Amino acid sequence: MKSLTLLTICAVLSVSLSMNDLALDVVLDPAPDPATEPAPAADSSASSSASSSSSSASDSSASASDSSDSDSSSASSSSSSSESASAEVTTEDPAAATEPEVVIMKRDLASVLLRRKRAAGQAAAAFTLTQVESLSEVCELNLACEHMAETAGIVAAYTAYYGPPPF
């Protein structure tokens, strides 16, 4: 369970770092002013190439980030404006976007563990101390059952390996 949690945290960090690199490229591009946009003829050619397919849109965004430093910003301004608008909606701050997901994941995990503990506690409360001791003696013979009894509770372990308790 710990290794799964560790892998999940590493995956979330990896994604957030990779998204952070992409966000820096988009954030560095200045947002174009609608009053300074070029003539409609240049807009129609740039918008048709950007909307033809997703691959051409990604190519135009790459060329927009490359050509924003050069003098030819007329073709890239319309494609970068659509790219920056979508970037503002999806990834304004990737680090802030992943932190609530981690908190939610931890909260969900805590609630699941609490529900399991309460369910095991209620099931164990239905048995007498002698009956629970009898279940644990049977479960001690199987190492996997004994390990599960330590983590999930004796009644859940006995039920998983031997079926419902006979009493």
From Swiss-Prot:
GO molecular function: calcium ion binding; hydroxyapatite binding; structural constituent of bone
Cited InterPro entries: GLA-like_dom_SF (IPR035972), GLA_domain (IPR000294), Osteocalcin (IPR039176)
The keyword Metal-binding is annotated on this UniProt entry: yes
Post-translational modification: Gamma-carboxyglutamate residues are formed by vitamin K dependent carboxylation. These residues are essential for the binding of calcium.
Domain Gla positions: 131-163
Source organism superkingdom: Eukaryota
Region (Disordered): 28-99
Binding site for Ca(2+) 1: 140
GO BP: biomineral tissue development; bone development; osteoblast differentiation; regulation of cellular response to insulin stimulus; response to vitamin K
The UniProt record lists the keyword Transferase: no
Chain positions recorded as Ca(2+) 2 binding sites: 137, 140
Disulfide topology: 139-145
Chain residues in the propeptide: 19-118
Keyword list, A-Z: Biomineralization, Calcium, Disulfide bond, Gamma-carboxyglutamic acid, Metal-binding, Secreted, Signal
Secretion signal span: 1-18
Location(s), subcellular: Secreted
Family, per entry: Belongs to the osteocalcin/matrix Gla protein family.
Protein name: Osteocalcin 2a
Lineage: Eukaryota, Metazoa, Chordata, Craniata, Vertebrata
